[in-house]
Amino acid sequence: MAGQFRSYVWDPLLILSQIVLMQTVYYGSLGLWLALVDGLVRSSPSLDQMFDAEILGFSTPPGRLSMMSFILNALTCALGLLYFIRRGKQCLDFTVTVHFFHLLGCWFYSSRFPSALTWWLVQAVCIALMAVIGEYLCMRTELKEIPLNSAPKSNV
């Protein structure tokens, strides 16, 4: 029995559902962050902000605001890793998977492979933030003490 504690069982359906769930968290929270930022600066929302690699940049205010939204989204998705993945070892795997599918989405949306250096830098920073913070949060919950006696104490 001791070898069975927190053993990893290969469950493809669970893994696929977690991938779909993390993609939903990623695009849902990114959409909310972009809508919030667009509302603050009274800009019209566009799918280009999410999928066009040329939008991200330091030189224009919309580019900087989109970059800020991506960074905030990485922090939000780290919470998604905590609540839905719950394993520190799998945080990097799911983070890279989410960003790989985002790369494919950007490639499909704009009909060209993302070549902007700022896009790649933002994605690298987001991967690092999401994976490290997600792993830290998951490890904190994994290392919590396990109560051995849950019965109430009696004053005998």
UniProtKB/Swiss-Prot annotation:
It comes from the Eukaryota. The keyword Transmembrane helix applies. One of its GO terms (biological process) is Golgi to endosome transport. It holds the Pfam family SYS1. One of its GO terms (cellular component) is Golgi membrane. The chain crosses the membrane at residues 13-33, 65-85, 91-111, 113-133. Involved in protein trafficking. May serve as a receptor for ARFRP1. Belongs to the SYS1 family. Interacts with ARFRP1. This is Protein SYS1 homolog.
